[in-house]
Regions:
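Divalent metal-cofactor coordination and adjacent catalytic microenvironments
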Residues: 1-153
């Protein structure tokens, strides 16, 4: 199970969309923000990667085999929490698991020493760029075009 924190778009994204849509007032800012958010999520689904960095928590079964993390590109891993069948969750020590973030920023994990954990929650940060202003122009324009399509229909 993969849980991503909501996309935190800034005023930059709303302003870019308003310019693209030729809106000059602030009356529709909330709906424009919702459209840009939906467009961004749509683009991320199409591209198969998170565009804007955010926190992710992913639950995986314990195994000694390498497992690929679901969100990409992975920037960093914050923690690995063991989830036992009974009892309280616990942080796994770094020597209990192995992590690899390859050159494509795909995250991989294996758990050779899980203790009593049958599953683990991996908390990590993933995304192509930190914020809207950092997106490549072609990608931000594509997101704006999707938002404009949603706005028109």
């Amino acid at each position: 199970m993969l849980t991503t924190h909501p996309v935190a778009l800034t005023v930059d994204a709303v302003d870019a969309a308003k310019t693209y849509l030729r809106h000059e007032t602030d009356e529709e800012d909330a709906s424009i923000l919702a459209l840009v958010t939906a467009a961004l999520v749509h683009a991320e689904g199409y591209l198969g990667q998170l565009l804007l960095e955010r926190n992710v928590v992913e639950r995986l079964p314990v195994t000694t085999a390498w497992q690929r993390l679901g969100a990409t590109p992975v920037r960093s891993v914050a923690s690995v929490t063991g989830i036992p069948a009974e009892g309280a969750n616990f942080l796994l020590s770094p020597d209990s698991y192995a992590l690899d973030i390859n050159r494509h920023h795909d995250g991989w994990i294996r758990i050779p020493h899980p203790g009593s954990a049958g599953q683990v929650d991996i908390a990590y940060r993933a995304g192509l760029v930190p914020g809207w202003p950092d997106l490549p122009e072609a990608i931000s324009l594509a997101v704006l075009r999707i938002a404009a399509h949603l706005h028109a229909h």
